[in-house]
A protein has these predicted regions:
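C-terminal segment of N-terminal export signals and the immediately downstream linker at the start
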Residues: 23-37
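Short, charged N-terminal beta->alpha structural module
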Residues: 40-61
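Feature activates predominantly on carbohydrate-active enzymes
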Residues: 52-55, 59, 92-286, 300-304, ...
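Catalytic-core regions of glycoside hydrolase
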Residues: 61, 134-135, 191, 203-206, ...
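Short, well-ordered secondary-structure micro-motifs within conserved domains or adaptor modules
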Residues: 68-93
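C-terminal non-catalytic alpha-helical accessory regions
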Residues: 137, 465-732, 736-737
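Glycan-association/targeting regions that enable binding to alpha-glucans and other polysaccharides
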Residues: 740-882
Length: 882
């Protein structure tokens, strides 16, 4: 057998001059497609591989091709194109695959190879995807050279939550929905699906919509316990279990792992007179044993459940430190009689809780939040907010003794989890505080996440899908999850709006270097000639909210901050703040970045400007300038797409256009408001009326932009988009205007004691706040060590190609509970040297570091810093030698 170039591949298939006729020609016997797979092979006979073969056959037949299945090429007889499913290839890693062109029996073929069933599923669904999105099936499979791919991340998971009986029952019971949705996930190389229950509320207080919240009695009747969720009847409970079994089996049928999230173990609701259900038959005495036995029954009844996710901190309804309770519950996993993963949400975790899980002998994961409860940039924050550092005085808290006290650093980050010798894997989870509803799609940022998700040996990432919390806290509405006021925009299934988002995440978490055709083919099918400019428009617009989340975030909690539709944080002094977990005094200028190591707050930057100096951190004005640039690029691309679109009234085009326009508006609003915030801080510190006037003008501009967003969105989205009960979690852009107007009036009325006539320093500060900053660029060369030996000094060198009078090394163990250290590097010409002390490296953690450069006549800057899209890791990481 030999490889075949693409041109010859097409020619031998008889398509070199008549590709357009393929659909009719392949209906003849001589135009048959042969799927050659020997069912005697153990891997090929696996149900998931057979399912994938069926998908490929359906793709061919949908294009008018005639398909035959054979065990060998000779058995296939006459065919025009063969797809050969090869036997196991040990050279390929788990979940990797190889596609290669070959000639067999003088016929063009594609050989698909893999080392496991999941690799074969990906190979075959990749071929099917090419056929579905191609103009003809043979040309779609013409490979210029062999394609070999392998996963960058071991776990690539999507989580979908049931939080509303009103909105979620329809999709939960819809078998057709599950078949299409799960197929879309595996085609895009997700390898785990997590059905999340018990997250409708963060606390068991004020509960109304409680369906499946404490999940067991909604699913199983446990012998010897007379426990039920009144008034749920037995038939509905049994139907719920039947559907859970179906969903888990359909997930496994496609070669994916099925994970069940059980986030609530409270059975009584506090101050909840209007709850829809009441759990009967449980007492403190039988609670733990019931949960254990219910979990065992659930796992035995649904053998395709391969893991359980638990929330083990106080919001589960179980006080932190209740080790005996969790030891009892985990026995339910052990009694299932097979390996079942225990995945514990990281908040409130301590070593003793880790020991309880490890003692089961089951595989254990701990899943910290990626960027608090939001979506930041595609790296891991260099530092957590000061509010998340450990705090004394909470040891006697009856519910949150750990997560509010000594283990506070695990509330919103990975904390101290990356220790050598850990008995658990780490799986990041991206929470839905930033992107809940608007369409997102930036290949550059998705690839950055693909590179960052195996940070320090992490297993990967679970993404809470769009609409994850829609209808939470009893706010479900019958008009549908997407929230469109114009019903013509509502897709058949809610996930279909986000098909492109799923494709980017799945493909680029699997392979951050994936060929762009993997997502562009989808856009070409959907949008024809407008595909390329739409890709650019959405990518540029999608860069706004992750950067905003990283650089300026008034609340780490998704309950408090909805970045797409934020409650207005006041600029003026003394106005009521809608956010509680934010620095005091609570106003726009004091808001912390989610990464305060690399980004400056408004107050911090204004102080620098007034001291006539610039710090090395990325400033709010730099962020504002990026927003201006990326939204301009998005708008131009959207205009190109509008000119090239086959139909501007097509629902898919309109959905993308409207969401892009809203994100453009958000970027421009925050660009103006960030500048207004810096100018107001200058006014607050100096009393300078020029600063006051410019702050007022910038804020007025921001207000006009917001009003335009809101007015356009009035025709697109319903007036009350519900992701929770209180105003910060629901509403519409129009609702936010009154608070903006009140704050704008307060800014106008503000007066501070004026100093003497403005100095040049103050005027320069005002000009820089309103100007167009350009970050200092210094070319450097650095070769990071591959590993280090704990207890030995780590010597680092940096070559600076240009003037730098001083270079500082900033370093820290990969432990967010610790603070960064720094030292001045010794310079000789362009070469700088520094040593991380041996005593500091003696720890169970890897090291991370970056450089601060201070040129003689320019602002300080950072190396490696960020690239032009803020889509890289801005520091170096060195792991311990094995």
């Amino acid at each position: 057998m030999k490889s075949i170039p693409r041109r010859r591949f097409l020619k031998q298939a008889g398509q070199a001059t008549a590709l357009g006729c393929l659909g009719t020609r392949l209906t003849a016997a001589s135009g048959r497609i042969a799927l050659i797979a020997n069912p005697a092979g153990k891997l090929i006979a696996a149900p998931s591989v057979q399912w994938a073969l069926g998908e490929l056959r359906q793709a061919f037949e949908a294009k008018g091709a005639s398909c035959i299945t054979a065990a060998t090429p000779s058995e296939a007889g006459d065919f025009s194109l063969g797809v050969i499913v090869a036997t196991e290839s040990a050279a390929l890693p788990s979940e990797g695959f190889r596609l290669a062109p070959e000639i067999i029996q003088a016929k063009p073929c594609v050989r698909a190879s893999a080392s496991d069933t999941r690799g074969f599923v990906y190979a075959l669904t990749e071929l099917a995807d090419r056929v579905r999105h191609g103009s003809d099936p043979v040309a779609s499979l013409a490979l210029a050279s062999p394609l070999v791919v392998r996963p960058a991340n071991l776990v690539r998971s999507i989580a979908r939550a049931f939080v509303s009986e009103v909105e979620d029952k329809s999709w939960y019971y819809d078998r057709a929905f599950w078949r299409e949705y799960l197929t879309a996930l595996v085609v895009n190389r997700f390898n785990r699906f997590s059905l999340t229950l018990g997250l409708g509320y963060d606390f068991p207080r004020g509960v109304t919509g409680d369906y499946l919240h404490f999940a067991y009695p909604y699913l199983v009747a446990v012998p010897r316990y007379n426990v039920r969720a009144a008034p749920l009847d037995d038939a509905e409970r049994d139907r719920n279990l039947e559907m859970l079994r179906f969903i888990s089996e359909e997930t496994a049928r496609r070669g994916m792992d099925f994970q069940l999230g059980l986030w609530t173990h409270a059975y009584e609701w506090t101050d909840s007179p209007h709850s829809d259900h009441h759990i009967l038959g449980l007492t403190p005495q039988n609670h733990g044993a019931y949960c254990r036995d219910a979990l065992t029954l659930l796992l035995k009844t649904c053998p395709s459940i391969q893991g359980i996710t638990f929330r083990v901190h106080g919001e589960s309804g179980i006080p932190e430190g209740s080790y005996d309770f969790w030891r009892t519950v985990f026995e339910g996993v052990q009694r299932a009689g097979r390996p079942v993963e225990i995945d514990m949400h990281a908040k409130g975790i301590d070593n003793k809780m880790m020991d309880v899980a490890a003692a089961t002998g089951m595989p254990v994961k701990i899943s910290p939040k990626y960027w608090a409860e939001h979506m930041g940039l595609g790296y891991h924050q260099a530092a957590i907010r000061e509010l998340e550092m450990p705090q004394a005085g909470h040891e006697d808290d009856p519910i949150f003794s750990l997560s509010n006290g000594s283990r506070r650093f695990l509330r919103y980050g990975y904390g101290d989890l990356f220790q050598e010798g850990r008995r658990f894997d780490v799986l990041f989870r991206m929470w839905p505080g930033t992107q809940r509803m608007l369409l997102w799609g930036d290949p550059v940022m998705a690839a950055a996440y693909g590179r960052a998700s195996h940070f320090c040996g992490a297993s990967g990432v679970e993404i809470c899908e769009p609409l994850f919390f829609k209808g939470r806290e009893g706010t479900g509405r019958p008009q549908g999850r997407c929230g469109y006021a114009d019903e013509s925009l509502t897709p058949k299934s809610d996930w279909q709006k986000y098909a492109y988002t799923y494709r980017l995440w799945g493909r680029l978490l699997y392979d951050p270097q994936a060929d762009a055709d993997q997502w562009q083919r989808h856009l070409r099918t959907e949008f024809g000639p407008a595909a390329h400019p739409l890709e650019d428009a959405l990518a540029h617009a999608s860069r706004v909210l992750p950067l905003l989340t990283t650089a300026h975030q008034p609340s780490a909690s998704n309950r408090g901050s909805w970045v797409e539709l934020p409650a207005n944080m006041p600029i003026a002094e003394g106005q009521p703040s809608p956010y509680s977990d934010t620095p005091t005094p609570k106003r726009f200028g004091t808001v912390s970045p989610l990464d305060p190591e690399l980004f400056a707050s408004i107050e911090e930057h204004a102080a620098e400007l007034l001291q006539d100096r610039r710090g090395p951190k990325y400033s709010p004005v730099e962020v504002a300038q990026f927003f201006e640039d990326t939204t301009t690029a998005a708008e131009h691309a959207l205009e190109d797409a509008s000119r090239q679109a086959t139909s501007r009234t097509d629902p898919a085009f309109r959905r993308m256009e409207e969401d892009v326009r809203i994100q453009i508006g958000l970027g421009r609003f925050y660009s103006a408001k960030l500048r207004a915030g810096v100018l107001f801080e200058i006014f607050r510190k100096t009393g300078n009326l020029e600063a006051h006037g410019q702050a007022l003008a910038a804020y007025g501009k921001a207000r006009a932009i917001w009003a335009a967003i809101a007015e356009r969105a009035r025709k697109v989205y319903v007036a009350d988009l519900t992701y929770g009960e209180i105003p910060v979690r629901r509403g519409h852009w129009l609702d936010r205007l009154p608070a903006i107007d009140r704050d704008l009036a307060a800014v106008e009325a503000s007066r501070f004691g004026a100093g003497p006539d403005p100095t040049d320093r103050v005027l320069r500060a005002i000009a820089q706040a309103a100007g167009h900053p350009a970050r200092t660029s210094v070319k450097c060369t650095h070769n990071p060590p591959k590993t280090f030996q704990p207890g030995s000094a780590v010597r680092l060198g940096l070559s600076v190609h240009g003037a730098a009078t001083e270079v500082h090394l900033h370093y820290r163990r990969v432990n967010q509970a610790e603070r960064w250290q720094s030292l001045v590097m010794k310079g000789e010409g362009s070469a700088f040297q520094a040593t991380i002390p041996a005593a500091y490296t003696q720890s169970p953690f890897a090291l991370q570091y970056y450089f601060e450069l201070r040129p003689p006549k320019a602002a300080p800057t950072l190396y490696p810093g960020f690239d032009e899209f803020f889509a890289n890791q801005p520091y170096f990481v060195v792991e311990k030698a094995i």
